[in-house]
Structures are given as C-alpha cells and as structure tokens.
C-alpha cells in the first residue's frame, strides 16, 4: 500500500506544460500586391517564396496590322529573402500609328516589365512585322511565344482596307481594327487590353488622296505578386 501511495504522489507532482498558442506574429504572412505602375515590393518577414504573374506592354498597331501581344508568366515561383526590397518596372503599351496627328505618331513596341533581378518579360512588337518570331526571355529554361497581331483584311478593290485585330495576351484581348464607312473612314482602332496589342488602322485609298484612321495603342503590362 505504501508503494501505491508513493506512485500517486509522484504522478500528482508532475507539471504538465501546455504548448503556447500561435499568434499572428508567429504565422507566415499571406497576401497579394498588384502593380500597374512602377514601384517597389518589400518582401514580408518570414516569407521565402513568392508567386509572380506578370506581362509586358502590348505593341501598338501599325498600318493595317495589329500589334503583338506581350510575353507573360503565370504564378511562377521565385525564392526571395525576407525584408528584401525589389524594384518593379511595368512595361507600358506601345503607341499606335496616327498619320492624322502633327507630327505623325509612329507605332512603337510595347515596354519591358522588369522585376528586380528575378525576371525580365518582353513587350509585344508593333504591328507591321509579322515575320518576326517573338521569343521572350523568362529566366531559366522557360520560353513562351507571344501571340502575333492579325494582319489587316482588305475590303476589296481600290477602296482600301480595314484594320487587323491586335494580338491577345494572357490578361486581355487585342484591340479591334479600324473600320471603313461607305465613303469615308469609319471608326478608329481600339486599344489592347492588359498586355495585348492595339488594333491596326483602316485606310481608304482615293484617286487623289488617301485617308487613315488611328491605330490602337497596346495595353500596359501588369505585375501581381502573391505570398
């Protein structure tokens, strides 16, 4: 009986330590930050990996040809250091050709999106050069072909041509091409969505002169960072 009492005494003397409850400060942070303009991203404390979705700027429409869509990545993982500051450059959409402005606005390629030293994403080519192969450098082994802007379609005879649609992108549709009215130029081409190419202009050819609509601008790029 004395041994039983001793056992009970020992058990009662044991101090059971409870595991402390986890607080928000002890848990890894989670969130999303979107950039449509240049800026900086500060990696939250305790975060060692981020997911990036991003694209360059779409190319502007040129002549009757739509601009190219930009290169893009979707939820690609990158290793980072906590509290690191990463500069972000968001590629701007290229300008669409406008022969009616003074001076004339020439079409331009879409801008490049740069995310620190992690990745560089090419913008789309301007329209009018669909023979080029657009191959974006994504870092590592990945290579994605951009979607080319469609060539403008002829409206037949000597009346001229409607504009081609801009090349699409992961985030937006290409701009619509300019249109021809019965006797005059119709609507201007529209701008591309995010990262997409602008539509090509319409052109009408007369006996003594020609008239043109405005080609669409490419859409600006975007950067979305998740952690």
Task: Give the residues covered by each predicted segment.
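Low-complexity, intrinsically disordered segments with a bias for serine/threonine
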Residues: 5-10, 158-165
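Residue-level detector of beta-strand structural context in well-folded domains
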Residues: 31, 39, 76, 111-113, ...
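Glycine-rich strand-loop-strand elements at beta-sheet edges
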Residues: 34-37, 54-117, 131-134, 198-224
């Amino acid at each position: 009986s004395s041994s039983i009492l001793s056992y009970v005494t020992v058990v009662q003397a044991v101090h059971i330590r409870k595991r402390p409850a986890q607080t928000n400060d002890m848990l890894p942070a989670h969130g999303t930050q979107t950039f449509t303009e240049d800026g900086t991203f500060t990696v939250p404390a305790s975060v060692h990996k981020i997911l990036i979705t991003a694209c360059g700027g779409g190319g502007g429409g040129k002549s009757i040809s739509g601009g190219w869509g930009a290169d893009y990545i979707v939820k690609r993982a990158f290793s980072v250091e906590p509290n690191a500051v990463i500069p972000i450059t968001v590629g701007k959409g290229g300008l669409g050709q406008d022969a009616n402005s003074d001076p004339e606005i020439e079409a331009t390629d879409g801008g490049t999106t740069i995310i620190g030293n992690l990745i560089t994403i090419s913008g789309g080519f301007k329209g009018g050069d669909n023979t080029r192969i657009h191959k974006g450098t994504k870092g590592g082994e990945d290579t994605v072909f951009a979607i080319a802007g469609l060539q403008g379609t002829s409206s037949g005879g000597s009346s001229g041509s409607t504009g081609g649609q801009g090349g699409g992108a992961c985030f937006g549709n290409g701009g619509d091409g300019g249109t021809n009215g019965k006797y005059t130029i119709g609507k201007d081409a529209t701008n591309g969505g995010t990262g997409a190419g602008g539509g090509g202009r319409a052109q009408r050819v007369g006996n003594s002169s020609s008239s043109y609509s405005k080609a669409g601008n490419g859409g600006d790029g975007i950067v979305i960072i998740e952690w």
